[in-house]
Amino acid sequence: MGRLGYWTLLVLPALLVWRDPAQNAAAEKGPPALNIAVLLGHSHDVTERELRNLWGPEQATGLPLDVNVVALLMNRTDPKSLITHVCDLMSGARIHGLVFGDDTDQEAVAQMLDFISSQTFIPILGIHGGASMIMADKDPTSTFFQFGASIQQQATVMLKIMQDYDWHVFSLVTTIFPGYRDFISFIKTTVDNSFVGWDMQNVITLDTSFEDAKTQVQLKKIHSSVILLYCSKDEAVLILSEARSLGLTGYDFFWIVPSLVSGNTELIPKEFPSGLISVSYDDWDYSLEARVRDGLGILTTAASSMLEKFSYIPEAKASCYGQAEKPETPLHTLHQFMVNVTWDGKDLSFTEEGYQVHPRLVVIVLNKDREWEKVGKWENQTLSLRHAVWPRYKSFSDCEPDDNHLSIVTLEEAPFVIVEDIDPLTETCVRNTVPCRKFVKINNSTNEGMNVKKCCKGFCIDILKKLSRTVKFTYDLYLVTNGKHGKKVNNVWNGMIGEVVYQRAVMAVGSLTINEERSEVVDFSVPFVETGISVMVSRSNGTVSPSAFLEPFSASVWVMMFVMLLIVSAIAVFVFEYFSPVGYNRNLAKGKAPHGPSFTIGKAIWLLWGLVFNNSVPVQNPKGTTSKIMVSVWAFFAVIFLASYTANLAAFMIQEEFVDQVTGLSDKKFQRPHDYSPPFRFGTVPNGSTERNIRNNYPYMHQYMTRFNQRGVEDALVSLKTGKLDAFIYDAAVLNYKAGRDEGCKLVTIGSGYIFASTGYGIALQKGSPWKRQIDLALLQFVGDGEMEELETLWLTGICHNEKNEVMSSQLDIDNMAGVFYMLAAAMALSLITFIWEHLFYWKLRFCFTGVCSDRPGLLFSISRGIYSCIHGVHIEEKKKSPDFNLTGSQSNMLKLLRSAKNISNMSNMNSSRMDSPKRATDFIQRGSLIVDMVSDKGNLIYSDNRSFQGKDSIFGDNMNELQTFVANRHKDNLSNYVFQGQHPLTLNESNPNTVEVAVSTESKGNSRPRQLWKKSMESLRQDSLNQNPVSQRDEKTAENRTHSLKSPRYLPEEVAHSDISETSSRATCHREPDNNKNHKTKDNFKRSMASKYPKDCSDVDRTYMKTKASSPRDKIYTIDGEKEPSFHLDPPQFVENITLPENVGFPDTYQDHNENFRKGDSTLPMNRNPLHNEDGLPNNDQYKLYAKHFTLKDKGSPHSEGSDRYRQNSTHCRSCLSNLPTYSGHFTMRSPFKCDACLRMGNLYDIDEDQMLQETGNPATREEVYQQDWSQNNALQFQKNKLRINRQHSYDNILDKPREIDLSRPSRSISLKDRERLLEGNLYGSLFSVPSSKLLGNKSSLFPQGLEDSKRSKSLLPDHASDNPFLHTYGDDQRLVIGRCPSDPYKHSLPSQAVNDSYLRSSLRSTASYCSRDSRGHSDVYISEHVMPYAANKNTMYSTPRVLNSCSNRRVYKKMPSIESDV
């Protein structure tokens, strides 16, 4: 150091200490001062001012210290000069810390600084040169920190370099330089505890103080290509020179040294060979200025932390001069706060040994230009290297290059080259893979990146390994950086071809297609794989058509099934059953039950439909043999049809996968993609042979597909599956592999891998390469030995190719069954429309169809009548004016029917029946026109004292809804045979049989009009009336009385509990209140008659009649009684408005004859018919003439003589016109079932009862056939000849029909045998079926030539009264519980206990008075037994006339006339 430098050191302390007194005072009050010295070697291009300016106000912001930087440059850095400068600086400036950097590569500098620090306790930072070099065995009390890495950290990086390049075999060479033991120990420990397959062959420790001969002997032990060297830089020169003489430097040897050997990178000894690898502290990216700044930051940060914690900074030693004393270690030093320091966002922490925790190390190599080159970086425990393949350097000019080690480039493309990550545990490549390096970009803008170690395998990798063993070469494998095969762009080749052309690689191995353009710049080997261009498409899930469930059969088959076969077969079954002699009552055969179950076309279609689909639906099976055969054949057809449908259904319900069909590159989809909607989308990977081929041969196609090109094969596969691409054009070998290994096998190649522009894959070598011939011979050998075929089977065959014939089943989704759900939805919509139309028709439109709107016969009636006329050939005379369809019109028609009768029976000796009348018959004035007034709805009845009959006040409101409620709640009223308004028992005028007198009240009750099909021709009625009696003018109705009281004249409400659903229309009638009855009232006249003079069972009317009989010209009375309901309906009476419930309830006694032997001696008279009354045939007893209905078989106590006296009259009457039929011997207790000739002729005009077509062809029953069996108690249980047997058929007779008792020539068709047996078991009425018909006639001989046509009158099998019927529940049952027990109940309940022969001969008739009492009182029930009564009228016509229903009768008749209209 010169004189100037010496004087500077003497004056500097004085300058630092001297201050102005004011400044000293301020300093005492200000923050504590921190003095830091910076000493650098003079060789650095930096001045002291620049060093002081490195710490400015911006760095001191936020610090509680006043930092003073003292900068000093030194010319010499030898140990003596270094100690002198530091001691002088400490004596003058009292520094707290020192930042030291030199430009030497001598580790002695670090040792001197460590000594000073341990003596003065001043923290010293060695930031550069020898001060930062590795130092072993530091003083424990030292506070010396270095910007460098420890021996262990550098050894770790050296092993990482060998691991990345797979240099697992190595040798270790060291000297006795301090720290070598630590280095050897760490290497051995790491190798022994690592999963990497390290092989440390030799550990050689040299002593350079001996002769060179011994060094050479030890170096000759090295047989590995990788050598780790730990020594000083001077020792390394000696060792490397000896290694060169031994041939241990060159292409195949890699020397790796720590930073001790490299030292100062600017000083490179000539003995260092090219390719020498060193791990050094980063001098390239970490400048000296940055290191100084970081050193200052570390010291100030540690001082601030100490000040914050202890509120003081330790004072430094004033001088290092003086007598040596034993140093005392302070309790708290700055060293403790320098271990964990973070400055300027960087972790600058130090270890306990004084080295950085995260040093910035780099890998440098001595290149061929003899310069250190940075090739890698260690940062954050990660090593990144520049070269994918470590470059082979020519160490010296006299070294020969090694041509057997090749650099090979490849391209990732499965299955030829598959790239995988290294094993995370061993950090190496597993078996059957080779190491390969892949370049990964870190910064896309600067293309900066790093090579990452990967593992490669695949078809081409296996070929490469075979070639390496056969041809004898080694290689380094790396992946092409741009991921392309090779294309010439701007006269520059890229991809694998570019690597070979520009000699960065010796050869290129992979899926490289041989073509003419590439062959011009590189040499190709023989093809090892045949390939070309192919097209890959994706299978798309096909949609299932909504009509898929119909596709198992063609449209013609469905038409034949549902239109032809079903309809035709149903019609055939119906026709066979219609005309079958043993079928249902649909063929109008003679003798069949007129209202039995019918077999319609609808039932036939329903039966066949149920058979087709095996539905468990209730059907009605035919009974005819022919129709059964037809149904059986249809059932066999249904089995075949359904089985065939089920077998083919699965094939049409699955989703068929759709694949685009492409024939080749010339396909229209490729050449004219815009012709499709949407346009056909296809593409390829650019810069390949496929794109070049398309560009050269199909320019338009190439121009179109550029927008759909893909970056790689994997991206193309994803685009195919997601629908972004319709077709992918690429190498056939790759596409076949991808199709075979695709998950789900959704990707397929067209034509099962059809190839266009066939070519092959080859290995590209540099032009004129000496390896070409050897590689060609090896490849041909592989093909000949079958090794190539084995590799193809291993890598190129996929699992999808083996599963082409496998059937894959899947669950049916909603798309598969969509058509069936659509059909159900359509059916529900159609049902809703039908439901709305049904209600619209019922409430709005049906009146016009039934003729209410036009006051003419309705359309349905006309169609039904026309069908009947066509089938039976009956001429129906058109009327000029249709009958009135209101209530008055119905009564007028019945009046004309009564007037058209030839004779009216003159009945006398009317018995006082159970007519609960509040008024006597004598109170009324006899008027011949009473019927006309009643029918005309005038209500002009008067008493004998000229008082008007007062109507009752209505107990119900005038609201029509109440009436509709009553109609809806009615239970047992049969509106088809309802009574007239104010109706009461008929009293026939005895003196004048042509006049009718009826006791009628003015109470207006709504009655139903008869069915239109039962109406008689107005012309015929008029003609008959003219022949018998002129038509009275009273039956001409006024216009105001022609009102429509019913909504429909065709359908009449039936009994809800009894009616048949198929034939009943429950419609409410409109009640009409007469004008003259609004304010009339009547008195409650319930009386109990005194039965002293007259019979006890006579009512008031009967007794009144008997009293006045002597002065009356009447001779006969015809009354009809039916069963009565118990008194007082809790539910309002139907069709009654003016009703007053009596306060005192009385139940009339029931007259019954308890003598079972009465009249058993009577005989049957010959059959005759007299239009007039047969007075001779009448009994002499006037008391009970023709009105003995109160006496039944229960009257066992009556004497025979009394019964003979009371029931001695032997004539019957016409049930319609009431004319007498006296020639028949029999006493009738109720209305006759027979008609006269006139009524028979009139009844045939509009009546379309099917029974009219039945001719009585049965043979007359002989006496033996009829009376051949003897019954027990024959005389007591004989049928009384005066007991008329009238059978009443309930609506449930259609369910259980009565067998034919009389006509044995025709079988019964009531029910099927199976149902009959089920119903007969344990049935109270089951005995009816088993009684012989011959027993029904007793022992009397038949007097009729045609047999007993009793089957025309069916008797209900079930009890007639609700109390005896276990299946019905009436409102009367509830009434009895509320009001009390009816006096007639004992008789009603005792009836079923009679004899067996009597149980099935009993019928219940509702008395006329039960519904027609003047005060609408409650009714009582009577039970009478009837004779089995044959018809007495001569059957001189073709048709037998059914019973005419008229409104004057109160008999409950549930039998409904059949209608073809209901079946149509």
UniProtKB/Swiss-Prot annotation:
Assigned protein family: Belongs to the glutamate-gated ion channel (TC 1.A.10.1) family. NR2A/GRIN2A subfamily.
Gene Ontology terms, MF aspect: ATPase binding; calcium channel activity; calcium-dependent protein binding; cell adhesion molecule binding; glutamate binding; glutamate receptor binding; glutamate-gated calcium ion channel activity; glutamate-gated receptor activity
BP GO terms, sorted: action potential; auditory behavior; calcium ion transmembrane import into cytosol; calcium ion transmembrane transport; calcium ion transport; cellular response to amino acid stimulus; cellular response to dsRNA; cellular response to glycine
Regulation affecting activity: NMDA glutamate receptor activity is inhibited by nanomolar (nM) concentrations of Zn(2+) in an allosteric way. NMDA glutamate receptor activity is inhibited by a low pH.
Extracellular compartment spans: 23-554, 647-814
Sites marked Functional determinant of NMDA receptors: 614
Domain of life of the native organism: Eukaryota
InterPro entries from the UniProt entry: ANF_lig-bd_rcpt (IPR001828), Glu/Gly-bd (IPR019594), Iono_Glu_rcpt_met (IPR001508), Ionotropic_Glu_rcpt (IPR015683), Iontro_rcpt_C (IPR001320), NMDAR2_C (IPR018884), Peripla_BP_I (IPR028082)
Main location: other
Binding site for L-glutamate: 511, 513, 518, 689-690, 731
In-chain residues carrying the UniProt-annotated modification Phosphoserine: 882, 890, 929, 1025, 1059, 1062, 1198, 1291
Family annotation (PANTHER family): IONOTROPIC GLUTAMATE RECEPTOR (PTHR18966)
Keyword Metal-binding in record: yes
Segments in the Cytoplasmic topological domain: 576-600, 616-624, 836-1464
Short name of any one Pfam family annotated for the protein: NMDAR2_C
Glycosylation: residue positions: 75, 340, 443-444, 541, 687
Gene from which this protein is expressed: Grin2a
Chain positions recorded as Zn(2+) binding sites: 44, 128, 266, 282
Location of region: Disordered: 989-1083
Tissue note: Detected in brain cortex, olfactory bulb, hippocampus including the dentate gyrus, striatum, thalamus, superior colliculus, inferior colliculus, midbrain and cerebellum (at protein level). Detected in brain cortex, hypothalamus and cerebellum.
Compartments it resides in: Cell projection, Dendritic spine; Cell membrane; Synapse; Postsynaptic cell membrane
Signal peptide: 1-22
Keywords on record: Calcium, Cell membrane, Cell projection, Cytoplasmic vesicle, Disulfide bond, Glycoprotein, Ion channel, Ion transport, Ligand-gated ion channel, Magnesium, Membrane, Metal-binding, Phosphoprotein, Postsynaptic cell membrane, Receptor, Signal, Synapse, Transmembrane, Transmembrane helix, Transport, Zinc
Protein species of origin: Rattus norvegicus
Chain's role: Component of N-methyl-D-aspartate (NMDA) receptors (NMDARs) that function as heterotetrameric, ligand-gated cation channels with high calcium permeability and voltage-dependent block by Mg(2+). NMDARs participate in synaptic plasticity for learning and memory formation by contributing to the slow phase of excitatory postsynaptic current, long-term synaptic potentiation, and learning.
Protein's UniProt name: Glutamate receptor ionotropic, NMDA 2A
